């Protein structure tokens, strides 16, 4: 159904034009073209599942790695999947369906704020949340998943600037869930 939504929007727009034309009041702005009127319609269409984030996919000879930014998936310091994450997770699930031949690893990572124990637990919960979402929402029950949390032990960017001050951009990059698909 996902590929048909643009046509559904065109159909809805055509119906809306007919209704708008039938309900047009005298003095409303419209152009007459031939026998019909052309109304200026302005509207905004949004994906109800949230903004679709582009996936960062790295592919090598041995694996495919998808990086999902935690700020797209979760609120800060939480492990509950946000509604806005659905489109991004659906994209990732499509890649998993296409590429996975064996066990798919889900690796959770955090920034360095908080204790090591807290970050370890949070990273495990986040990896498990993505695994559960794939199984429950995308129906990937027949695939093998392994989830693991790494806490703040595998940063991809510095958590602090060279002068020792906080680096919010670096910390944001470190908060992520990686999907690793072995070839």
Show the residue positions of the predicted features.
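Acidic/histidine-rich, surface-exposed loop or edge segments in extracytoplasmic proteins
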Residues: 65-76
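Periplasmic OmpA-like peptidoglycan-binding domain that tethers envelope proteins to the cell wall
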Residues: 109-183
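Periplasmic peptidoglycan-binding/anchoring modules of Gram-negative envelope and division proteins
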Residues: 45-59, 74-107, 179-183
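Short secondary-structure boundary/capping segments
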Residues: 55-57, 64, 96, 137, ...
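Conserved beta-strand core positions
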Residues: 64, 102-104, 145, 177
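Glycine- and acidic-rich phosphate- and metal-coordinating loops
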Residues: 67-69, 104-109
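Compositionally biased, non-globular sequence tracts
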Residues: 23-29, 35-36, 83, 91-94, ...
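N-terminal targeting leaders that direct proteins to extracytoplasmic destinations
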Residues: 1-63
